[in-house]
Curated annotation (Swiss-Prot):
Belongs to the arminin family. One of its GO terms (cellular component) is extracellular region. Expressed in entodermal epithelium along the body column. Residues 19-58 form a propeptide. It comes from the Eukaryota. The keyword Methyltransferase does not apply. This is Arminin 7591. The modification Leucine amide is found at residue 86. It is found in: Secreted; Target cell membrane. It comes from Hydra vulgaris (Hydra). Residues 1-18 form the signal peptide. Keywords: Amidation, Antibiotic, Antimicrobial, Immunity, Innate immunity, Membrane, Secreted, Signal, Target cell membrane, Target membrane.
């Protein structure tokens, strides 16, 4: 009878330890993920700073054209073509 209680007691300890182990494992995993994300954010910020410096080094006219993006002008292209054709007729 004592051996049965000993086995049950050891099984209870093993189950308790395994749940705690899983919790600790999950916490470590979350901490590692957070550290990786922080490092990536720092790298992205450094990259953005470097790009901004390169843009500021360009000539003023080139900076002006870089600010004008194709996406901003794209909706106006069909209207410009119609006006161009209208002016030719």
């Amino acid at each position: 009878m004592r051996s049965a209680f000993a086995v049950l007691f050891l099984a209870l300890i093993a189950i308790t330890y395994s749940k705690n182990y899983e919790d600790v494992k999950e916490e470590i995993k979350n901490e590692v993920e957070n550290e990786i994300l922080k490092d990536l954010e720092e790298d992205v910020n450094e990259f953005d700073d470097n790009v901004q410096e390169e843009v500021n080094d360009a000539r003023p006219l080139r900076r002006f054209f870089r600010r004008i993006r194709g996406r901003k002008l794209l909706p106006y292209v069909p209207t410009a073509i119609k006006l161009w054709n209208l002016g030719k007729k």
